[in-house]
């Protein structure tokens, strides 16, 4: 099973490495887009002299920046220099903008000089380090430049032409909207940046050079589908999902942080249909009205989208209509799904816990065991929020925790950055989304790692602050399993159990899911024993030998102290455990 996990992580790394070469340079793409929108012949302020800058930026500056960044990712400054030299060979060896070539030659240059250094660095005699380092970078870069000029450039040029022709054929066949069947689910799998900046941005820039705009910039950045789903929750949702959806709408639509609506979709997986329907209808409208943008819209905010639309009223209206249609369609589909739902309450926290368990099961793993880790101001000197791109939702999560840390009177810096830029430094607390934690641990094994389901709404932040201030230990940090063994339900006498209580500490989400799981098992086996949840502080009411209390390993000591006379079932996970079936098999009520 671990092979599947590593394969999934490798796929994520590939997509992330592509987007990480583009995203740090998005400012240059936007500058080029503004220059194009203003000064070309059909721009807002036509200027022949300034328009001459458009071509060199597209042909040389942008690809070299990508190649430089790709080399830097592999081997720092030396890798960046060699990657940039190699990229120039690909650029001059082709007649098309060499973005894909830069994505190949940049990392290749960094990898080559890295291997050279690993082999020869220790063999350099004292006093010759600068001479060898400078000449080795120059000669390796020179060799790769020749390779790129004669081999990589022409090959990539042919491939780029083929891909461009394929995209053009898809557009002409009116099949581009079908891409949203893949794009919308991919967002939740953390591939949105890889798709948008690793694939659509390079192809879109080439389309802008030829046609002045590109619809590809709108495929992933369209905020309409997410807006419609959040609006449906605001009207037809229940509980915390309904009350929190209004604020989420503002952050999503105007802030461009699309990750904020992912938990709402995962709460009701059928809402993937709403997201896909909205994406398909929005892209169809864009295609029908010949809409497009002049540069990437990053983040996917309606403000960024309007700012990068072509000159004129109609181009802006066409873009807005596509967003509106996507929002309306996703709202209607989501409204039908939510209206037909018969559950009494939508709990974001419970849905996030269930999502974490489902993801772990899909990877062939059990949910991470909860442990008590020693986190204090002595063991943590800085906190880093890490995600694919190092911006967006991680930046907002860092802002939320930074405010809590400041209010607690702690002087611990809280920042955000891309996982690919993490360093293996001790006394660092790294916060990542559960799906990305394996990669973060691989980059920084010496750090303390905390997994959250949602950067923008997590009770874990209060736990982190409480642990840092010494108020309480932080639970569910990735670490070793405690040596204390769980209490087997088969050791308990279950013939006289009158009630089952699922205990929880600060967060009720997983306890609620566990409670519902036990109830479902009891219904199937016709066991008429009430099942409920209770805070640890309320367990005194259930301190009886005919009460079964279910809890996790990390809370075992507190629960047994609160209700010493009760019977206990200690499990790894309140959401997914075989112990519930074993317990039910030994009950006769």
UniProtKB/Swiss-Prot annotation:
Its EC number is 2.7.1.197. It is found in: Cell membrane. GO terms for molecular function: kinase activity; protein-N(PI)-phosphohistidine-mannitol phosphotransferase system transmembrane transporter activity; protein-phosphocysteine-sugar phosphotransferase activity. The gene is mtlA. This is PTS system mannitol-specific EIICB component. The lineage of its organism: Bacteria, Bacillati, Bacillota, Bacilli, Lactobacillales. The phosphoenolpyruvate-dependent sugar phosphotransferase system (sugar PTS), a major carbohydrate active transport system, catalyzes the phosphorylation of incoming sugar substrates concomitantly with their translocation across the cell membrane. The enzyme II CmtAB PTS system is involved in D-mannitol transport. The EIIC type-2 domain forms the PTS system translocation channel and contains the specific substrate-binding site. The PTS EIIB type-2 domain is phosphorylated by phospho-EIIA on a cysteinyl residue. Then, it transfers the phosphoryl group to the sugar substrate concomitantly with the sugar uptake processed by the PTS EIIC type-2 domain. One of its GO terms (cellular component) is plasma membrane. The modification Phosphocysteine is found at residue 387. The chain crosses the membrane at residues 26-47, 52-72, 136-157, 167-187, 275-294, 317-338. It comes from Streptococcus pneumoniae serotype 4 (strain ATCC BAA-334 / TIGR4).
């Amino acid at each position: 099973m671990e092979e599947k996990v590593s394969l999934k992580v490798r796929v994520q790394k590939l997509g992330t490495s592509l987007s990480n070469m583009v995203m740090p340079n998005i400012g240059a793409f936007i500058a080029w887009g503004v220059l194009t929108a203003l000064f070309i012949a059909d721009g807002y302020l036509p200027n022949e002299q300034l328009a001459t800058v458009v071509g060199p930026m597209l042909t040389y500056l942008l690809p070299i920046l990508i190649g430089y960044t790709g080399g830097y990712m592999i081997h720092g400054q030396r890798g960046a220099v060699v990657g940039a030299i190699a990229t120039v060979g690909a650029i001059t060896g082709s007649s098309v903008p060499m973005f894909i070539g830069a994505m190949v030659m940049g990392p290749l240059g960094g990898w080559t000089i890295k291997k050279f250094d690993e082999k020869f660095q220790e063999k350099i005699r004292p006093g010759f380090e600068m001479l060898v380092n400078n000449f080795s970078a120059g000669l390796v870069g020179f060799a790769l430049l020749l390779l790129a000029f004669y081999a990589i450039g022409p090959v990539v040029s042919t491939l780029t032409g083929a891909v461009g022709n394929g995209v053009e054929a898809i557009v002409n066949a009116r099949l581009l909207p079908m891409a949203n069947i893949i794009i919308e689910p991919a967002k939740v799998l953390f591939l949105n940046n890889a798709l948008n900046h690793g694939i659509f941005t390079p192809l879109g820039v080439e389309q802008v050079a030829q046609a002045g705009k590109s619809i590809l910039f709108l495929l992933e950045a369209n905020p309409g589908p997410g807006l419609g789903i959040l609006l449906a929750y605001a009207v037809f949702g229940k509980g915390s999902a309904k009350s929190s959806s209004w604020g989420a709408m503002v952050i999503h639509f105007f802030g461009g942080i699309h990750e904020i609506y992912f938990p709402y979709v995962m709460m009701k997986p059928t809402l993937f249909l709403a997201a896909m329907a909205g994406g398909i209808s929005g892209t169809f409208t864009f295609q029908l009205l010949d809409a497009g943008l002049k540069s990437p819209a990053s983040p996917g905010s309606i403000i960024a989208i309007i700012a990068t639309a072509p000159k004129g009223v109609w181009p802006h209206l066409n873009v807005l209509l596509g967003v509106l249609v996507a929002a309306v369609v996703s709202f209607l589909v989501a409204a039908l799904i939510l209206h037909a739902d018969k559950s009494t309450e939508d709990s974001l926290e419970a849905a996030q816990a269930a999502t974490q368990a489902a993801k772990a099961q899909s990877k062939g793993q059990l949910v991470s065991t909860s442990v008590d880790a020693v986190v204090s101001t002595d063991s943590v000197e800085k906190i880093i929020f890490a995600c694919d791109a190092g911006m967006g939702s991680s930046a907002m999560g860092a802002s939320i925790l930074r405010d809590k840390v400041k209010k607690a009177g702690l002087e611990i810096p809280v920042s955000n950055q891309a996982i690919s830029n993490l360093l293996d430094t001790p006394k660092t607390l790294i916060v990542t989304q559960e799906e990305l934690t394996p990669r973060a641990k691989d980059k920084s094994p010496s750090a303390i790692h905390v997994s959250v389901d949602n950067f923008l709404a997590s009770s874990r932040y209060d736990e982190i602050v409480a642990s840092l201030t010494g108020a309480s230990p932080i639970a569910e940090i990735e670490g070793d399993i405690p040596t204390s063994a769980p209490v087997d339900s088969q050791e308990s006498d279950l013939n006289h159990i009158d009630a089952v209580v699922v205990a929880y500490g600060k967060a009720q989400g997983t306890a609620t899911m566990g409670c519902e799981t036990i109830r479902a098992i009891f219904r199937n086996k016709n066991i008429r024993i009430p099942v409920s949840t209770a805070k640890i502080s309320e367990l005194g009411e259930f301190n009886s030998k005919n009460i079964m209390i279910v809890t996790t390993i990390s809370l075992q000591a507190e629960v047994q102290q609160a209700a010493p006379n009760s019977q206990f079932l200690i499990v790894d996970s309140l959401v997914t455990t075989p112990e519930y079936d074993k317990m039910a098999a030994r009950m006769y009520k």
